[in-house]
Amino acid sequence: MQFKKLTPPTEGEKIEVKDGRLQVPDNPIIVWIEGDGTGPDIWRAAHPVLNTAVELAYGGKRKIVWFEAYAGEKAQAVYGELLPEDTFKAIAEYIVAIKGPLTTPVGTGFRSLNVTLRQELDLYACVRPAKWYEGVPSPMRHPEKVNMVVFREATEDLYAGIEWEKGTPEAQKVIEWLKKEMGVEVRADSGIGIKPISEFASKRLVRKAIQYAIDNKLPTVTFMHKGNIMKYTEGAFMKWAYEVALNEFRDYVVTEQEVTTQYGGKAPEGKIVVKDRIADNMFQQIQTRPDEYHVIATMNVNGDYISDALAAMVGGLGMAPSANMGDYIALFEATHGSAPKYAGKDVVNPSSVILSGVMMLRYIGWNEAADLVEKGISETIKQKRVTYDLARHIGVEPIKCSEFGQAVCENMREIAKKL
């Protein structure tokens, strides 16, 4: 693979796909993108945590070989563009990548860098776990009941970026066409956006969500939609979701209706209950009955909203990991923004990118290292050694971003001694 300005590591081996499965060497090359704003801060904490976990879990027999690629402001400085071809090529070639937050100029016509990465690499599933860690302040009375994973379709819906500004020739042309050809009146001073929801994209997203529930022995998958209003987009998503469940996973699933009519209200042992919820009701459900939901499969906009709401319930975006997945390529990322006003101040919570690293470790099958990181973070928070975002709720003096990373490493070493 030839790059314009990137130099691959001289050590390490590529992760490969054979017979539909990842083949992970003991020294995999993993692409990382520092990100903008607080990106350098969180990575100075995260890299030592992930490296220490791997070293402790495998006695030095395994090691991540990091390969830096560029996006955002750093890419602009190196390449003169925000998202160079080298970065797409590196992620596609090495399969697994992880990144910090990226800044997209607002209202300037630039498409979101995060959206562009997902669309160009066909990373169609945005996977967002929401899990509470003991000691994290939460507005919920029982945050320990929140343990869900959102599968959000990431290439379509209103976030596809098919829109035109009010007053442009393109917007006027669409408005005129709608009136002339479809008999639909739209105000002349409107901006226009298109909401595509396809059968293909919907079904592959749901397929991935149900397979995740099977692999992780989770009891429910819920299809979230607003099909009562948007019948031919969100309603179609619900219809296609059930088709996947009942045509492709019939041996594994039972519908909520079948549980009621055929099984006396109790799901049969070993079966996954598939059900659907109207989007606005879903926001009530996650607060009032969180333990009844485990995997949520939904479209792009709904998924964005519900995953951020869930993050707030378990400690905020600073505690929220994320992954963008295709069939094999996976890009893990911090969910929070670049927070430029805090850049270089060593104050932000690095847990989002660290926990995204946990997801990454599980994706490559290194569960022992992933478990160690989670235990290290949990222990550090229980000790009330936390950054300002959590400290202000707990009523303790905050520690620095880098100090949090050091504390997690210390706790992992103590935990490893007892294993």
Regions inferred by a protein language model and the residue ranges of each:
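Glycine-rich phosphate/nucleotide-binding loop
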Residues: Q2-T10, E73-Q76, F283-R385
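N-terminal phosphate-binding or glycine-rich loops at protein starts, especially the Walker A/P-loop
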Residues: F3-G60
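Glycine-rich phosphate-binding loop
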Residues: A90-T104, E248, Y252-L331, M412, ...
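N-terminal glycine-rich phosphate/adenylate-binding segment common to multiple enzyme folds
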Residues: K74-E181, V301-Y305
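Glycine-rich phosphate/diphosphate-binding loop of Rossmann-like nucleotide-binding domains
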Residues: P25-D26, V31-H47, K173-R277
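N-terminal beta-loop-helix "entrance" segment that forms/cooperates
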Residues: G59-L83
